[in-house]
């Protein structure tokens, strides 16, 4: 499932960054977003146009078209 399908206040692990261009991948890395990292959906706007996630105690805002590239799974750590 993608980050767009995440449920608020649940913790997920990013398992893959799929099919995005190199510039977006570098942007993700600058935010600390990479495979294996834990993230929590804090808030989403109406229709999930934008998402606010927590990664390593940092809050990051993403657009839905960016979040679609982040493949996640539910984390064993809650």
UniProtKB/Swiss-Prot annotation:
Keyword annotations from UniProtKB, A to Z: Ion transport, Iron, Iron transport, Transport
Gene Ontology biological process terms, A to Z: iron ion transport
GO molecular function, one term: transition metal ion binding
Highest taxon listed in the record's lineage: Bacteria
Pfam annotation, one family: FeoA
InterPro entries noted in UniProt: Fe-transptr_FeoA-like, FeoA_core_dom, Transcriptional_repressor_C
Family of the protein in this entry: Belongs to the FeoA family.
Function: Might be involved in Fe(2+) ion uptake.
Protein's UniProt name: Putative Fe(2+) transport protein A
